[in-house]
Amino acid sequence: MADMSVKQLADLVRTTPERLLEQLKEAGVAITHVDQTISDEEKRKLLLHLKTSHSTETDKKRSKIVLKRKKLSVVKSGKKSVNVEIRSKRTYTKPVVEQKRETEPAPTQEVPLTSDTTNLNEKAEVNVATLEKAVEAEVKEEAKKTPSEKKETPKKGPRKETRRSRKPDKEDKWEREELHMTKLVEERRRRHKPAHMPDSDNASAKLEQGFARPTAPVVREVALPESITVADLAQKMSVKAAEVIKAMMKLGAMVTINQRIDQETAAIVVEEMGHKPKLIKEDVLEENLVATLGEQTGEAVPRAPVVTIMGHVDHGKTSLLDYIRRTKVTSTEAGGITQHIGAYHVETELGMITFLDTPGHEAFTAMRARGAKCTDIVVLVVAADDGIMPQTVEAIQHARAAKVPVVVAVNKIDKPEADPERIKTELSTHDVLPEEWGGDTMFQPISAKTGEGIDALLERILLQAEVLELKAVDNGPARGMVVESRLDRGRGPVATVLVTSGELHLGDILLVGREYGRVRAMIGDDGRPCESAGPSMPVEVLGLSGTPVAGEEAIVVPDERKAREIARFRQGKYREVRLAKKQTAHLERIFDRMGEGKQNTLNIVLKADVQGSLEALTEALNKLSTDEVKVNIIASGVGGITESDVNLAIASDAVVIGFNVRADAPTRVLVEREGVDLRYYSIIYDLIDEVKKALSGLLAPEFEEKIVGLAEVRDVFRSSKIGAIAGCMVVEGVVRRHLPIRVLRDNVVIYEGLLESLRRYKEDVAEVRQGTECGIGVKNYNDVKVGDQIEVYEKTQVHRTIA
């Protein structure tokens, strides 16, 4: 601060110059005139003097505090009134503190302001409690009659003691009530403290609890179940639900706050918002089940190999198995092709083998993949006269994916056009090399018709099984896999189960995916009932709650209640995931709906005999959809056609298709009465061809233009009635009346219209051939000039089909 005069300093501190000069003199500063300049050092000296003098005076004054209280109150009892005066006096002395030297800086220490107040309140309460003992009993009775007055005047003055006031029970009761009211009053005073007087006790706490803005974005690890609502997801990320909805709109999905989304979508949203997703599988019940069952304890014994026969359609897979079983399995299949997975247990002279016969048609891809999943060895059947086909290559891929060895059976070698060497060469292009060429694949030429080479093929299969050392525990709870399932009328759900380990008995509680039930009956592959089934044995199981999905694992559970809980848990989880994936408000679907007005749809109600065929048909029919026509399977199921299926078809204008199933008598009556299109099929080729024809009929018509004639304008005649008439020479083809035309000028189309009039020698004619003159009148067009060309064409409709 710059030096200033004494007068200026006096004006600054708001005092008189004379008073300031006196204080400077007391402080020992040599300044005698108001115009003299005072330095910073002299100011500090003056300030130190003032502090010392003021602190000494206040210490003397404030070292002792005397509090005096005087309260007047009137207590009424009937007609009498008593004046009560309460006087209290308290003296508080400040403790002596040693003064430190002036050279040392005095530490600043906060003294809580509420400590003295608290002591005062406590002492005042004690004083009031002692004074209450002198109040008369008449006052107590009046206070009982008027409790509201008691609340207003809770503290009573001292009175002369009477007999009634000496009673201990009433005295204690009055003392407790008044003491309680005193505390309430004190608490109310504290609670309603003015806003400009902050509580010193909480001052430091409020400073410490202030909100600190984060310096960096907070990255959280968000646990995501298999399905979650948008609101729960927002809560886990500590953001508003509107932010999550906005992020999903940027990703192309429109959702609501209560809509469920699947785990994959939630993980994408969490990553988009800068957090880390943690995927959680809600399979605690299943893990507990596996833990209770544990590993099967028992000695593993050799088991029969499970062999899957794969190959292209009509290459002789079922005929080969037919020869081995000595039965005509092929004759029972419609059209001579396999449309189910057949599981057969065969006892040969060399040992036992379980065969799985898979379909070869392209629609049964899922069945072949399922067959390769639960097999030990794959026998690839290739026709020697046909060679490698698409399903042959697909079977090789399934075998490699399942990591199972392949044995190639070259069939139909009894035909004169058979060429086994060509088969080896073609398979070598797919990395299937025979042993004689340095590979690891066994090749065996066979004939399913004559039986040639089949014994050698069985030897190779069992040799491969010995190399694999196939073993399984043959006792304890059974485990297996569902090969096929269907809904049988009269028997209910039927599942073909291939036992992989343990032993399955009648009465066991079987858990299969989302279905469960007690095994009511077991039927072997020969059609005979059996009571137990060991490893590598296929059996048909009756008694499940529904038709399980083919490919599900079957496991025996000791407790039916636990099986029911797990099945219901899986059903609920499946439903939640399915609903979460069904995004009805997805942006892409909105755009699809905008174009659906131009797309024709064929609605189908599909019923099949087994689950595998239903899957294959659904996939094959959905592949037929194009940009113009669409197959919409509104309902599908396993079992016969019922009235509910027909009613659904009536409501949705659909075609009912039954594959190897029929409708009962009441349903047929309903079909005839309502005129529903009901079709039966037993061969998948016929079904797909018929649906293709139906879709072809829904295609928009396509027209092809064909130029039939060309005329050149030589002259133009104008008439007030007719308009412009072009005198033309037909230079090419034939000109016919009422056909569409184009007017060309310098080879540029300037008008398209209709040929309205055609004359020759003032007579109307139907057509004019090449080299003939004629007059042509064009409808609603009069700007014809010499040198123009009139092109006459016709439109023909082209029959369109689905490729």
From Swiss-Prot:
Pfam families: EF-G_D2, GTP_EFTU, IF-2, IF2_N. Residues 357-360 are annotated as: G3. Residues 302-471 form the tr-type G domain. InterPro entries: DNA-bd_dom_put_sf, EF-G-like_DII, IF2_II, IF2_N, P-loop_NTPase, Small_GTP-bd, T_Tr_GTP-bd_dom, TF_IF2_bacterial-like. Residues 336-340 are annotated as: G2. The keyword Ligase does not apply. GTP binds at residues 311-318, 357-361, 411-414. Residues 411-414 are annotated as: G4. It is found in: Cytoplasm. Keywords: Cytoplasm, GTP-binding, Initiation factor, Nucleotide-binding, Protein biosynthesis. Residues 111-121 have a biased composition (Polar residues). GO terms for molecular function: GTP binding; GTPase activity; translation initiation factor activity. Residues 311-318 are annotated as: G1. It comes from the Bacteria. Residues 138-155, 168-178 have a biased composition (Basic and acidic residues). GO terms for cellular component: cytosol. Residues 447-449 are annotated as: G5. Its main location: cytoplasm. Belongs to the TRAFAC class translation factor GTPase superfamily. Classic translation factor GTPase family. IF-2 subfamily. This is Translation initiation factor IF-2. The lineage of its organism: Bacteria, Pseudomonadati, Pseudomonadota, Gammaproteobacteria, Legionellales.
